[in-house]
Amino acid sequence: MRVNITLACTETGDRNYISTKNKRTNPERIELKKYSPRLKKHTLHRETK
């Protein structure tokens, strides 16, 4: 079952990205390095509700 998730920057708190994930294969929260437009660099983004 795929669900929509929001990825928020850990440094600014901005919610920059929306993605989907499979809850059966990835039950834990996702952490990805993505580009933050406000900081103009790549930062860690975590899954939020």
UniProtKB/Swiss-Prot annotation:
**Keywords assigned:** Ribonucleoprotein, Ribosomal protein
Could you list the residue ranges forming a coiled coil in this record?
none
Question: GO biological process: any one?
Answer: translation
Which InterPro entries does this chain map to? Ribosomal_bL33, Ribosomal_bL33_CS, Ribosomal_bL33_sf, Ribosomal_zn-bd
One Pfam family assigned to this protein is Ribosomal_L33
Keyword hit for Ribonucleoprotein: yes
The molecular function terms of the Gene Ontology recorded here are: structural constituent of ribosome
Look up the domain of life of the source.
Bacteria
Q: Quick one: a GO cellular component term?
A: ribosome
Tell me if Transferase is a UniProt keyword of this record. no
The entry sums up its family as follows: Belongs to the bacterial ribosomal protein bL33 family.
Report what the protein is called.
Answer: Large ribosomal subunit protein bL33B
- Which species is this UniProt entry from? Oceanobacillus iheyensis (strain DSM 14371 / CIP 107618 / JCM 11309 / KCTC 3954 / HTE831)
What is the organism lineage in this UniProt record? Bacteria, Bacillati, Bacillota, Bacilli, Bacillales
Gene of this entry: rpmG2
